[in-house]
């Protein structure tokens, strides 16, 4: 990594962290009483689903299954009843399977190990990265749809050159040494609230001055 590249990455992460503290979302239910379990459920529910849709489902889910231990005692049919209307029902099946595995192997305590985490049903690299970063405050990247869009626009990566392998490398380099939990929430929030798919609010973006897609 060159000195100029390092400065760009540092600029990006520092500005996002500062923006998140002042303007990011802080009132989402999974941002309160943060735990690996709550982050995991929220990340699974948010896959291909908007926050406003997930909110009531997450609240109901936590009321019925406040802990991983409670969830591990559940039947799949009960989980599916709560999930009705949220769609992508395989996610509920993965949650059920994973809760049983964690109960059996880890006594219903979420594993603080990335390699073990990505072996669990329904937990891919990005979901594991979010859990490791937000819940365990470890230095791991994520690459969900919103983050991909932010990275592609900031570095002006066109679709034909935007392979996941390349984007993962950018994502890894952007994660700061400190405050990585705040940074992770920040880059997700930026993609969800300002750097949206349609009609992005570029004028309010905290990294617009070095964004290669920003139109002055």
Segments predicted by a language model, with ranges:
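Charged, often flexible domain-edge or linker segments that flank or initiate folded functional domains
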Residues: 1-3
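Catalytic cores of DNA base-excision repair glycosylases
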Residues: 6-9, 15-216
């Amino acid at each position: 990594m060159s000195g100029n590249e390092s400065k760009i990455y540092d600029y990006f992460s520092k500005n996002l962290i500062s923006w998140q503290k002042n303007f990011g979302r802080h009132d989402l239910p999974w941002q309160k009483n943060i735990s690996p379990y709550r982050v995991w459920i929220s990340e699974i529910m948010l896959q291909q689903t908007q926050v406003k849709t997930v909110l009531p489902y997450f609240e109901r889910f936590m009321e019925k299954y406040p802990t991983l231990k409670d969830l591990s005692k559940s039947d799949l049919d009960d989980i599916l009843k709560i999930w009705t209307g949220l769609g992508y029902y395989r996610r509920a099946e993965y949650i059920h399977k994973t809760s049983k595995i964690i109960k059996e192997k880890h006594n219903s305590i979420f594993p603080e190990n990335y390699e073990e985490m990505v072996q669990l049903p329904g937990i891919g690299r990005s979901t594991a990265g979010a859990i490791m970063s937000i819940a365990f405050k470890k230095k791991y990247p994520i690459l969900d749809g919103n983050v991909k869009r932010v990275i592609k626009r900031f570095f002006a990566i066109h679709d034909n050159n935007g392979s996941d392998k390349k984007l993962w490398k950018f994502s890894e380099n952007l994660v700061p040494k400190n405050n990585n939990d705040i940074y992770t929430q920040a880059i997700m929030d930026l993609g969800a609230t300002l750097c949206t798919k349609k009609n992005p609010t570029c004028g309010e973006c905290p990294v617009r001055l070095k964004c290669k897609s920003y139109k002055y």
